[in-house]
From Swiss-Prot:
The keyword Transmembrane helix applies. Pfam families: COX2, COX2_TM. It is an enzyme of class 7 (translocase). It is a multi-pass membrane protein. It comes from Formosania lacustris. The lineage of its organism: Eukaryota, Metazoa, Chordata, Craniata, Vertebrata. Cu cation A2 binds at C196, E198, C200, H204. Its cofactor is Cu cation. CDD domains: CcO_II_C (cd13912). It catalyses: 4 Fe(II)-[cytochrome c] + O2 + 8 H(+)(in) = 4 Fe(III)-[cytochrome c] + 2 H2O + 4 H(+)(out). Its EC number is 7.1.1.9. This is Cytochrome c oxidase subunit 2. Mg(2+) binds at E198. Its main location: mitochondrion. Component of the cytochrome c oxidase (complex IV, CIV), a multisubunit enzyme composed of 14 subunits. The complex is composed of a catalytic core of 3 subunits MT-CO1, MT-CO2 and MT-CO3, encoded in the mitochondrial DNA, and 11 supernumerary subunits COX4I, COX5A, COX5B, COX6A, COX6B, COX6C, COX7A, COX7B, COX7C, COX8 and NDUFA4, which are encoded in the nuclear genome.
């Protein structure tokens, strides 16, 4: 969960998000080193009178400023491509959930069950209980078993939406008439918050996403109760 004055990302709750955090640190280190090098060159150039200001040609300098950026781009591209393919992998999902965006709420359908679906609306501020988060709580949470591959099918009923869950490293556009898919594995139990991340109208800010990751036995009990109430 994000908190005031936070500078970094949320704590990772999935293997993909852990990889994204590592890549962020890797890229940030490269940017920091480049910035330090440029700053050093500027300072030394300005502060010394020994710099030759009339160089018209230097084969060595041209080789360095061509090869070095190419190597740096390769150092950034290789781990980036690895994570890109990792995010697209969906191997043998244990559970498939269809998330449908509406103006302005989400509906969820557990496609492995005959009749397990519900709408998820934001809880108004005046109805919140102590300890709940304003604009982030919903009347029905999407409950998933932890340490299990979960496939999410994302679409929309009316306009463009986007199903985003930062702690899981997931963001997938919901497009009317199109079925997109993504996946995640919750590596620990907890309640994780997200929001619609595509401007979709007047109440765009009021369609939160709440995912609760629980042990498999708790998920089975929850699904049994939901099927009885259906």
């Amino acid at each position: 969960m994000a908190h005031p004055t936070q500078l970094g990302f949320q704590d990772a709750a999935s293997p993909v998000m852990e990889e994204l955090l590592h890549f962020h640190d890797h890229a940030l280190m490269i940017v920091f080193l480049i910035s330090a090098l440029v700053l050093y060159v500027i300072i030394t150039t300005v502060s010394t009178k020994l710099t030759n200001m009339y160089i018209l040609d230097s084969q060595e300098i041209e080789i360095v400023w061509t090869v070095l950026p190419a190597l740096i781009l390769i150092l950034i591209a290789l781990p980036s491509l690895r994570i890109l393919y990792l995010m697209d992998e969906i191997n043998d999902p244990h559970l498939t959930i269809k998330a449908m965006g509406h103006q302005w709420y989400w509906s969820y359908e557990y496609t492995d069950y005959e009749n397990l679906s519900f709408d998820s609306y934001m809880i108004p501020t005046q109805d919140l209980t102590p300890g709940q988060f304003r604009l982030l709580e919903t009347d029905h949470r999407m409950v998933v078993p932890m340490e299990s591959p979960i496939r999410i099918l994302v679409s929309a009923e009316d306009v463009l939406h986007s199903w985003a869950l930062p702690a899981m490293g997931v963001k997938m556009d919901a497009v009317p008439g199109r079925l997109n898919q993504t996946a995640f594995i919750a590596s620990r139990p907890g309640v994780f918050y997200g929001q619609c991340s595509e401007i979709c109208g007047a109440n765009h800010s009021f369609m939160p996403i709440v995912v609760e990751a629980v042990p498999l036995s708790h998920f089975e009990n929850w699904s049994t109760l939901m099927l009885k109430d259906a």
